[in-house]
Swiss-Prot record:
Organism: Mytilus edulis
Binding site for Cd(2+) 4: C44, C56, C62, C70
Protein's name according to its UniProt entry: Metallothionein 20-III isoform B
Function: The metallothioneins are involved in the cellular sequestration of toxic metal ions.
Residues holding Cd(2+) 6: C52, C64, C68, C70
InterPro entries reported in the protein's UniProt record: Metalthion_mollusc
UniProt-annotated binding residues for Cd(2+) 1: C14, C18, C31, C35
Taxonomic classification: Eukaryota, Metazoa, Spiralia, Lophotrochozoa, Mollusca
Amino acid sequence: PGPCNCIETNVCICGTGCSGKCCQCGDACKCASGCGCSGCKVVCRCSGTCACGCDCTGPTNCKCDSGCSCK
């Protein structure tokens, strides 16, 4: 559904064919919009068709596109 922006548990691997944009390993595992990542335990999803920002690392500090909310 949405991008996987999450806290790393082991290693961050963005899904096949996904852009490496926003993808980091360390404190957080972040993949480009529409991509999934493995080795994660916290996922932020924005409502509807909205995308989460690259700095989203979980429900407590989730930032979504204007006019959208996080779950």
